Amino acid sequence: MIDLAAKPFYLKPEDIEWVNTTLAGMTTEEKAGQLFCVLFKECKPEEFEYVFNILKPGGCMYRVVPTERAIAATQNIYSRSKVPPLIAANLEKGGNGIVTEGTLVGAPMEIAATDDIGMATKMAHACAAEASAVGANWAFAPIIDIDTNYRNPITNTRTFGSDPERVRRMGRAYVEEVQKMGLAASIKHFPGDGQDERDQHLVTSINNMDCDPWMN
């Protein structure tokens, strides 16, 4: 039995009662749906109609859409969800990771070039403030990969650079700020990627680094 009052949940008695009551009232299909996070590319009503007729997902991810559409999407999702949903976006550079009108603060490598963790905090603040304004509560960020090839098309400027210590400091500052703002941070890593100069979405890329330097 999971102790919901203990780490990492720390729920109050009334919160635990809500969890138990809600869980008891869910069908097997609804419970299974909580395991899914569905990508909505355009956040249009017909997308939600199609998905929610198949399952009731516990999480949804938005691509970049206009602000009004993102707000309408959140309202649509909440109206269909028995459990408050997780709503995520790639909040790597600013609020522009979720809405077209969002603020582009700077790519992580630009932020790292300042060598000022205060800038990472400001970028994270913009991400969290603008995403939460349209209902998002989950950041698919920060990326904590280490840049090992400036020609790599996947990570490169999406990272906080080639210095592991700077990556750690910047990534930590981002996580602390978005969590303080009430969003969940999901540290992102692309295992084995970063060495090749080709896009692994299009071809099978190659990691030619030996095991020892890769692990260290």
Question: Residues of each region from the PLM?
Answer:
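Glycoside hydrolase catalytic-domain context in secreted enzymes
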Residues: 1-216
